[in-house]
């Protein structure tokens, strides 16, 4: 089972990590000099690898009583909706400001250069529901923390935050006050 301590590694085995890393492209100096971007699109286009990644991630949570998965647009939707299907639970879209038509909860969060706002419908989560946060990459943790704060503001319980990729040097898991699982770590 995955490690529940937020400061310790909840991640795939080294063999699984290496298998998935083969399909994550490294792009140096993008979006700016000195940054190495981890591009998951090669993994997304390999159906069998994408399926295995989703199954491997979802397997960790099959006995956790997950009622909902909350994911942030855009790549988070890809993984979160697929995991919700695998776990047979509901899916909650967390959107950037101004994208949802109904009454919303909003949460501001810090970006590398400025601020951002995430939103979720006010009726998306019932009080006490067990929610798994899913996104593509954990970097600084700002987006995941804002998502967790939205879940808590709605009365939901954050079970864990799960990511396809974790950039460990940015210490994003230290920002979160919930367990963290990552399939691949750099």
Language-model segments: what does each one mean?
Residues 2-16, 22, 145-186:
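PRPP-dependent phosphoribosyltransferase catalytic core
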Residues 66-67, 129, 159:
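Conserved acidic residues
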Residues 136, 141:
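Conserved G/P- and acidic residue-centered "switch" motifs that form tight phosphate/ATP-binding loops
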Residues 2-66:
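Active-site-facing substrate-recognition patch
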Residues 78-89, 148:
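Short Gly/Thr/Asp-enriched flexible loops that form oxyanion-binding sites at enzyme active sites
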Residues 65-73:
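Short glycine-rich phosphate-binding loop at a beta-alpha junction
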Residues 89-131:
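Short, glycine/charge-rich flexible loops or terminal/linker lids adjacent to PRPP-binding catalytic cores
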Residues 34, 69, 91, 161:
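Residue-level signature of catalytic and energy-coupling elements of molecular machines
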């Amino acid at each position: 089972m995955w490690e529940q301590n937020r400061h310790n590694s909840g991640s795939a085995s080294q063999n699984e990590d290496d298998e998935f890393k083969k399909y994550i492209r490294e792009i140096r100096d993008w979006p700016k000099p000195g940054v190495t971007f981890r591009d998951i699109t090669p993994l997304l286009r390999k159906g069998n690898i994408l399926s295995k990644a989703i199954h491997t991630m979802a397997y960790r949570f099959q006995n956790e009583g997950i009622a909902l998965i909350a994911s942030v647009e855009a790549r988070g939707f890809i993984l979160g909706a697929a995991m919700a299907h695998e776990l047979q639970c509901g899916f909650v879209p967390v959107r950037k400001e101004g994208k949802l038509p109904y009454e919303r909860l909003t949460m501001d969060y810090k970006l590398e250069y400025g601020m951002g706002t995430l939103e979720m419908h006010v009726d998306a989560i019932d009080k006490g529901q067990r929610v798994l946060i899913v996104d593509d990459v954990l970097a600084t943790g700002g987006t995941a923390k804002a998502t967790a704060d939205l879940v808590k503001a709605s009365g939901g319980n954050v079970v864990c935050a799960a990511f396809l990729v974790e950039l460990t040097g940015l210490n994003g898991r230290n920002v979160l006050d919930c367990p963290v699982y990552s399939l691949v770590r750099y």
